[in-house]
């Protein structure tokens, strides 16, 4: 089953708290993942904070259309102890 992002909150820097539909939750640090033309605007922290959870794509999306596959986010998830 493909994981679905159901909630995301800004934590700090390039870190988001993400909750998945299967109950998994934790933090994802995007700092090393922001590469390429579509992701370049995300280097600006105020812009990075301006995301939403797209209910059709089931992932985090920014205004310019940049997104990360939910499977990728699931793999990068750092579960909080």
What residue ranges belong to the model's regions?
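Motif-centric detector for short Cys/His coordination patterns
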Residues: 1-81
